[in-house]
Structure formats: structure tokens, C-alpha cells
Amino acid sequence: MQFSKNWLRELVDIKVSTEELCEQLTLLGLEVDNYKNYQSDLTGEDSVIKLDITPNRGDCFSLLGIARELSAFYGSQLSYPNPIEVKQSIESPLDVKVCKSAPSYIGRFITKIDLNKKTPLLIKERINLSGFRSIDPIVDITNYVLLQLGQPLHAFDQDKLQGDLRVRFPKKGEKLTLLDEQKIQLDDDSLLITDEKKPVALAGIMGGLETGVSPDTESIFLESAFFKPGAIRGQARKFKLQTDASIRLSLIHI
């Protein structure tokens, strides 16, 4: 995982040099692979730090997790992101039913989307410095939240969903074409997101191509979920899909 030092400083007040910060991160068990200085047109002098995080530190696969460790060490104030409440303005057009392998599954419908709009430059810079390519505002904001909070999000094109959503295991013979165009034959233990007609995502790993966001997308269902780590870990290995979402969801977060 790599990140901007200036972005980290928004979450925890650290006044040490980049070199000292890297030494302290390593002592805290977050080994620094490398770092490089960067001059930002938006935030001034900055550094990009790359960590080699071990599987037992799943709580540090986010800026907030790293900031929490540094806050405890330095005795500095931890500043949580301040969410803005957005009241519901439309009725939910569908229902969601889940199984026990999805202890938490929530989402929000967002309409009147214009993908001709550009991602704000600061968000674009931060995800680029973190090793992600800026694609469009929807993908960019899901990656931003993933990096900052460690919570994977997935956006479905609402107009491509047919009926209610389900979190379930496959029916015999079901298949799914993923966003990377890989076609997979689903096993009995492959946890899925489906609508009433078909599978639409391999839960916690990758969405399906058929319901993916495109330049013509106007409405989305934005998913935020926690799946039991064992249900994700085995499938990620089986299909050789170690995605940024599956890495985080397959680890136990503290």
C-alpha cells in the first residue's frame, strides 16, 4: 500500500520528517518498502510512502488505520473524516435480502449522474499517488474511500439490475462474466450478489460486466458490505483474483 504523507497528515498531526516517519512505521510493524519526495501543485511539498503490510495487519490497509497507529504512538489527536448527512430523497426501487455470510450489507441509490463531470483534482492526485489510475468520478470515489477508510465499495448500474438484490450461493450451472471479461463457472461455495435473473457480482471480489458502470450510466446502486472473511479468501484464491477489495475483506479488521 502506498499513500501521500500530506493526506495522512489530515488524519493525524505528525510534524516529523519523512525519514523519521518511515523509521517509526517500521518499528510499529508496518515495514516501509520505499519513499520518494514529491512536489504537488495542490498541497506543496509531499512524500509518497510505500508500505509492505503483512496479512496480520489488516487493520492498516487504510490511511485511517495507519493514522490510528501513529496517533497512539505520538499521542496526537486522531481526526476522523467528517461525514455530511445526505437525506434520502427517493424511495428504494428494490429490496435486498442477504444470507449469513454477509453480516452487513447496505447501499444507496444515486440518480441523475453525469459522468461527463471531472473528478476533483485533489482526489485524482491522491489516488494517482496511491497507485490507482483515475477513470471516472464513480470509480475514483470508490477507490478514494477504499484507501482512506479501508472499506470497499462497488457501484452497479441501477438500470441494468432486474428486480431485487440477493446475497446467496450459486444455483447449479450458474456462470458469471466479470468486469475484466473473465468468464467463471461458479462453485457451490462462491458467494454471489444476484438480481432476480442472474449473478451480478462475485461478492467482495469483483463485479459483473453486465451490470457495470459505463459512460451512459445515469443511476447507480452503491454497495458497502462486510462479508465473512472465509467466504472471500477461498474464492479469491480459487479464481486467482487478488483484488484490492478482496485483500481487505479477506482479513479480519480490528
Indicate residue ranges for each PLM-predicted region.
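RNA/tRNA-interacting regions in translation and RNA-turnover enzymes
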Residues: 1-252
